[in-house]
Amino acid sequence: MSQNGDKDHELIQGKVKSKTEIEDSVILDQDTLQGKGEEKTKLDELIRWEAEKNDLLKLIDNVGNDEVFTTVETCQRMLDDLFPQDHEVWSNPDLKWLNPCDKNGVFFREIALRLDKGLAKVIPDEYERKKHIMTKMLFSIDLTKFTSLMVRRTLYYCIKANKRKTSEDEGCAIANGAWFNNECGNVVKPYKEHYFDKQGKNKKCKFCRTDEKFKYQQSSSNEKYAYDFIHLNPNEYESYFKTNFGVMKFDVIIGNPPYQLANNRGGDAGDGNGANPIFQEFILRALELQPKYLAMIVPARWINSSEKVFLKFRAKLQKSNGFKGINIFFDSKHCFPNRQIKGGVCYFNWQNGYEGQTLITTKSSKKGKQEEIETYKRDFFAPVLNNTEQVIFRKKFDTTFIKR
């Protein structure tokens, strides 16, 4: 996060305007967001530094408690660790990439840069190569209407993917809007709703378990936080992906899903304060699509937590195994400098059909001092003992260190 421009920094952090106020004002003013003439818009307040010398994705750290934005540095490190430069994903033009929980476009921006380099010999023409990457390889499902604007701005340089240059307005999308025939491009604006059971006093969404009376259903909010990817019935997959992308099969699924839905007691993203964890639902949904690779950055507490939701989650994961590598950071600030996430965070590379040992890398800190990184291989899931649950890291696991 840049330290320049306190006013803008406070605005972006939501100290001057709340998350809801920023999101709602941007969404309601979409028709004027192009900034014609001298007109100033709400989105301009968030992005005006981008045209100068600053990186928008380094400026915006977080717009709310429910979604933790991935920093550019963390995204780059995650890609370096899970998919090294010589990995096949960077030189295969036929792969389809899906981010089912996009927030700011950081993953696909960094991925596009690497694909542009890796596909140089396969598609020598620079224009055709970039067009192929953007139109045939990268597909995004956004979390909110607000984040869909950010993602398109990041990937296409404009909130309308088919925006062309006009005499009245100098702004235009990538390739002068010629690569797409619609405003969204390959970035889906969410449109699903929560599904509440009609029976019982405390009605909860059957997909994410949020309460019908909670803030996500307030009439004053333009966002319902009914994340499309986990609010789809299995029989909707084909029509959803075919309608929005014209693609049915995804080879690489990657992202940083929302960690949980905040609660009325002030639960924050990842703090475990009684809120409903939902990141595991994104992982399970992704596995249902049977990609070749799955990579996500999520809270690490699922690994050995005794919470019922994570016991069930691990039981389902054991059926697929496939964990080729996992990096665990017991201090979440290694990945998110401005966030404290209970139990740390981890990112992993799941590979379809992989049955070998898992390369485990751990990093811990003590009293603010970074300790050495520890790397080793072992079976990710321990053998079943006396018909009890298979567990990961059967010896002591805490938020500081793993003892083997």
Curated annotation (Swiss-Prot):
Family: Belongs to the N(4)/N(6)-methyltransferase family.
Gene3D superfamilies on file: Vaccinia Virus protein VP39 (3.40.50.150)
One Pfam family from the record: Eco57I
Keywords tagged on the record: Methyltransferase, S-adenosyl-L-methionine, Transferase
GO BP annotations, alphabetical order: DNA modification; methylation
Protein name in the entry: Uncharacterized adenine-specific methylase MPN_108
Top enzyme category: transferase
Gene Ontology MF term list: nucleic acid binding; site-specific DNA-methyltransferase (adenine-specific) activity
Key word Methyltransferase present: yes
E.C. numbers: 2.1.1.72
